[in-house]
Amino acid sequence: MPGQVAGTRDRRDSRWDEHRRERREQLVQATLTAVSKHGAGVGMDEIAAEAGTSKTVVYRHFADRAELYVAVCTRVAAQLLPKLRDAMDSGGSPRGMVAAAIDTYLTFIEGDPELYRFVVDQQTLDRPTTDPLTSLSDLVGAQVAAAITVALQQAGADPSPAAPWGHGVVGMVRAAADWWLRADRPMPRSALAAHLTDLAWAGLSGVVSTKEDK
């Protein structure tokens, strides 16, 4: 009998945990929709209204706005990273891989600038949190570094600079993308992507490119 009671309790706990996970995902999706409707400065009342509930219910699932913010950023990173990987995989040459990654990142920003602003701007949070793009930038930097490593090895060159170069490219692109958005996109995305690719490749081509890439 005690075993049956424990088993019933475990099943109830499992169902409740699953319900909580599903409800959190629904609230994250509601936040994304609310950001699209109301902009990066969306309030918790607007998020709750989009979810068809109250702020009290939202705070049952997220301790504060910062926790919800981190969950949204995690969702954004999970959606963006596979696109970046696919773009790099289809890039072909090392230069093509760098160009594809840069354009994919800028396409994300251009497609939903308010969501990007929501992700990078923490001024509306009730407590500070870590930069949500740091982990994503680290992952992307590692991907770029891996591509550079292969190219260096193929060229018979020392692969040790690949990591700082890969992360340096990502940092440059992020800084330029932030400027582009703040300046109200003074040039087309394609032009910015081409300029950044040219600048990045000017530093890399001497040691990683083939004659066809130069």
Task: Describe the residue ranges of each PLM region.
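Amphipathic alpha-helical packing segments from all-alpha helical-bundle domains
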Residues: 128-153, 163-171, 175-178, 191-194, ...
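Alpha-helical DNA-contacting segments of helix-turn-helix folds
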Residues: 35, 69-76, 119, 136, ...
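Short hydrophobic clusters on alpha-helical segments that form packing/core surfaces
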Residues: 27-35, 80, 84, 105
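Short hydrophobic/aromatic patch on the recognition helix
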Residues: 52-62
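Short secondary-structure transition hinges
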Residues: 100, 107-146, 156-161, 186, ...
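Hydrophobic alpha-helical connector segments
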Residues: 71, 86-114, 166-169, 193
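Basic, helix-initiating cap at the start of DNA-binding domains
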Residues: 1-50, 67-70
